[in-house]
Amino acid sequence: MDENRSKALAAALSQIEKQFGKGSIMRMGDTDVAADIQAVSTGSLGLDIALGIGGLPRGRIVEIYGPESSGKTTLTLSVIAQMQKLGGTAAFIDAEHALDPVYAQKLGVNVSDLLISQPDTGEQALEIADMLVRSGSVDVVVVDSVAALTPKAEIEGEMGDSHMGLQARLMSQALRKLTANIKRTNTLVIFINQIRMKIGLMFGNPETTTGGNALKFYASVRLDIRRTGAIKKGDEVTGSETRVKVVKNNVAPPFKLAEFDILYGEGISREGEIIELGVNLKLIEKAGAWYSYKGEKIGQGKDNAREFLREHPEIANEIDAKIREHSNLANAAMTTAPDEESDE
C-alpha cells in the first residue's frame, strides 16, 4: 500500500476509534481476535468433547431445545454451576416462573449468588438480559424459555385475540440489539426453547422451535437434547438416559453426539460418563458385567463401578485427565478437574 493510502487508512482508523471507542475496528493479526475461543464447561465430559472446544463458547448465543422433561434446564444449571466454580457470575431469567432453587442447589449451583429475574412480559425479560450483558460483569445469562416470552400486547389483550408473528418480531429485534453487546462483553447467553409441530406438513421434519427463525441464525451453537430411556434400580426409576446432538456449531465441526445419564437429585453423572468414555477408549476394561482399571476390578455393573469412582475421586480424576488428553481437551481439564475433585 502506498504512503498516501496508508496515511488515509490510519486517519480513518483513528477517527473510527475516536468516535466509536477503542476496539471498534482492528486488524485480525494485531489483537487477541485470532486467539482461541474461551469455553465454559457444560458439566458433561462427553458434551464438552462433542462441542470441540471444551464447552459452550463465551461471547456467543447458544440455543438448547428439546421436548418436555428432556433435561434442558438441568443442562443449563450445570453450565451455571461450572461457571460459578471458576468464580463467574450467572443470571437466570425465569420467564416460565418454574425454577426450583432446591433442585438447582443439588446440581451444584450456588443459589445465594445466582441472579434471578421473573419478568412479567417478553419485552421486560429481553431488556433485562440486554442490561445484564451490557454491564460486562455477568458471565452467563440464561433465558428460560423462549416460548414463555409473551409480548406485552398479548398479555394486555383479550384471550381470543390473534397476535400473529408478535413473538418472532420481538425475538428478531432483541437479538439484533443483543449480538454486538454479547461479543463485546464476552458473555455467554443461553436461550432454552421448546418444540412445536408444524401442522399439515407432508414431508420432512414436522418439528420446529418457537419464536421464529431469528434465533436459529443468531445462535452460534444449537443443541437438541432428548431423553432416550430410563435408569432403574429395581422397579424404581432413578434417572434418565440423555442424548444431545450438536445441530449447529460455528466454532467447531457440528453434528456430533453426546450421551450421558441424568440422575434425579444429582444431575449429570460425571462418573457414568467416565466409565462409558473410558470403555470406548479402552482405558477401562469390560468383561461381562465387570469393569476393571489397570487390571484391578472396580465394580460389577455400571452402578457399582460408578459408586467406586465416587468413593475414589483420585482414580476418577486420573481417567478423566486421560480422556481429555485423548480428546485434545487438556486445557479444559485444568480448569474443571480440580474443582470437581474438591467437591467429592
Curated annotation (Swiss-Prot):
Its main location: cytoplasm. ATP binds at residues 66-73. SUPFAM superfamilies: P-loop containing nucleoside triphosphate hydrolases, RecA protein, C-terminal domain. It is found in: Cytoplasm. One of its GO terms (biological process) is SOS response. InterPro entries: AAA+_ATPase, DNA_recomb/repair_RecA, DNA_recomb/repair_RecA_CS, P-loop_NTPase, RecA-like_C, RecA-like_N, RecA_ATP-bd, RecA_C_sf. GO terms for molecular function: ATP binding; ATP hydrolysis activity; ATP-dependent DNA damage sensor activity; damaged DNA binding; single-stranded DNA binding. Keywords: ATP-binding, Cytoplasm, DNA damage, DNA recombination, DNA repair, DNA-binding, Nucleotide-binding, SOS response. The keyword Nucleotide-binding applies. Transmembrane segments: none annotated. Belongs to the RecA family. Can catalyze the hydrolysis of ATP in the presence of single-stranded DNA, the ATP-dependent uptake of single-stranded DNA by duplex DNA, and the ATP-dependent hybridization of homologous single-stranded DNAs. It interacts with LexA causing its activation and leading to its autocatalytic cleavage. This is Protein RecA. It comes from Methylobacillus flagellatus.
